[in-house]
Every structure is written in structure tokens, then in C-alpha cells.
């Protein structure tokens, strides 16, 4: 299942800001970047719509897999996991999260991948 629109991170300015200034947490198969939300970087229609909520994005390059089916499967898996984890997060969670998968991620089973995602979210302080 995909992330609801209120939880999606959109816009190149948001991604550039996260890439440049976000705190990085490294795992064996992914990199998690976190930064405090900055609603001014959102495009106008999305700026006031739940601007204090956690917003997430998952980036999977073609280096992970040349097959779009595999990349989309991994993206849906992580979207569903992030949605279930961050919906129960505290209301004061006002961070933006970007997950970038490394090329080794396509060879890893789903459960170790999700465990690593949880571990990185815990390191970032987004899960209690």
C-alpha cells in the first residue's frame, strides 16, 4: 500500500534540502536521512495540509535492480512499513525521512530489510 498524500515527501527542493542538510544513518542495505520539517520548502498546495506530520520518501535507483518490478516491490514494501510505523508515532513527530536503498538491497529478504529500517528509525529517534 502506498503512503497517504499527507505523508509523502514531494518536490526537488525538499529532496535537495534533505540530501544536503539531513542527518544520515547508515545500514548495510540502506541510508536513512532525517531532518526537521520545513513547510516553506513544500509547494503551495501541500504547504498547509498537515505540514507538521512526518513525511517520507523512498529512493531506489536502477543500480539496485534493472527491473522496475523489483524496484517497485521494494518501494511498496518500505512505504507500507513506514506508514504502519510512523502513523503510531507521537504527534510531535515533525520530521522528513528519506530512505535510499543500496544495490545489495535487492538480494536481501523482506524481514531483514524491515528490521534494518526499524533499527535506523530507532537510531534517528523516530520510534519509541
UniProtKB/Swiss-Prot annotation:
GO terms for molecular function: ribonuclease P activity; tRNA binding. GO terms for biological process: tRNA 5'-leader removal. It is an enzyme of class 3 (hydrolase). Consists of a catalytic RNA component (M1 or rnpB) and a protein subunit. Keywords: Endonuclease, Hydrolase, Nuclease, RNA-binding, tRNA processing. It comes from Prochlorococcus marinus (strain MIT 9313). This is Ribonuclease P protein component. It catalyses: Endonucleolytic cleavage of RNA, removing 5'-extranucleotides from tRNA precursor.
Amino acid at each position: 500500500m502506498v503512503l497517504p498524500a499527507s505523508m509523502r515527501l514531494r518536490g526537488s527542493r525538499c529532496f535537495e534540502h534533505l540530501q544536503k542538510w539531513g542527518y544520515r544513518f547508515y545500514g548495510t542495505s540502506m541510508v536513512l536521512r532525517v531532518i526537521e520539517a520545513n513547510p516553506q520548502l513544500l509547494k503551495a498546495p501541500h504547504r498547509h495540509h498537515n505540514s507538521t506530520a512526518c513525511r517520507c520518501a523512498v529512493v531506489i535507483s536502477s543500480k539496485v535492480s534493472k527491473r522496475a518490478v523489483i524496484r517497485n516491490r521494494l518501494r511498496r514494501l518500505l512505504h507500507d512499513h513506514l506508514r504502519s510505523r510512523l502513523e503510531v508515532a507521537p504527534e510531535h513527530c515533525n520530521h522528513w525521512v528519506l530512505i535510499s536503498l543500496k544495490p545489495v538491497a535487492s538480494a536481501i529478504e523482506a524481514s531483514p530489510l524491515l528490521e534494518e529500517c526499524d533499527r535506523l528509525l530507532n537510531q534517528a529517534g523516530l520510534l519509541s
